[in-house]
A protein has these predicted regions:
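Hydrophobic residues in beta-strands and at strand termini
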Residues: 48-50, 96, 143
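Hydrophobic beta-strand-centered segment that forms part of the acyl-chain substrate-binding groove
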Residues: 73-107, 113
């Protein structure tokens, strides 16, 4: 019987959150309110608990929700290298390995695999508390500055903080996050 080996990866900083984003929005009561972090190894990480309201079957997270979480953590990985740049999804392939329980503390991490000009490819994993990979993804993203995303959405990039777009620190933010060791 094999046991999962874990490593602690240091958190460098929290990442931005939005007021009303479905994944990270702190004001979105119907959302997931996931917290995102930049890690010292260049990856992005997410900590979250999916409420029962987002099930596909009783007690199981809807596949679209877990796919959205993976999409977000991989798209955010570019900001570790380029702080004012965000990944906008072009293509995402998600694989589901195990049922994902609702109302359970979960984690995910995303990484950049290759950067080519204005695009990048990345991958991500969503973990159960015991370190089992419950879902994984690969994707292609376009790099866009947050100012452009805001402008194209009809927002003033200079007032994003007023709409809740900011880095938030919480008293219970981790100094490091425990993840299974990856087989490179």
């Amino acid at each position: 019987m094999s046991s999962t080996e874990f490593e602690l990866i240091k958190v460098i900083a929290p990442q931005h959150t939005s007021g009303n984003c479905f994944i990270c929005g702190v004001n979105n009561q119907a959302g997931l309110q996931a917290r995102f972090y930049e890690l010292e190894n260049g990856e992005a990480a997410a900590l979250f608990t999916v409420p029962e309201a987002h099930n596909g079957y009783p007690g199981r997270v809807h596949g679209g929700v877990s796919g959205a979480l993976l999409d977000e953590v991989v798209g955010r990985a570019i900001t570790v290298m380029e702080p004012d740049t965000w990944g906008v999804t072009v293509e995402l392939h998600t694989r589901y390995h195990k049922p994902i329980p609702t109302e359970t503390p979960l984690s995910a991490r995303g990484r950049i695999e290759k950067v080519k000009g204005r695009s990048f490819t990345g991958s991500g994993d969503l973990y159960l508390p015991d370190g089992t990979v419950a879902a994984s993804c690969t994707g292609t993203y376009v790099k866009l500055p947050i100012e452009r995303i805001a402008t194209e959405s009809g927002k003033d990039p200079h007032t994003l903080a007023e709409e809740g777009w900011m880095k938030r620190s919480y008293a219970d933010d981790p100094e490091a996050i425990r993840f299974p060791k990856r087989n490179e």
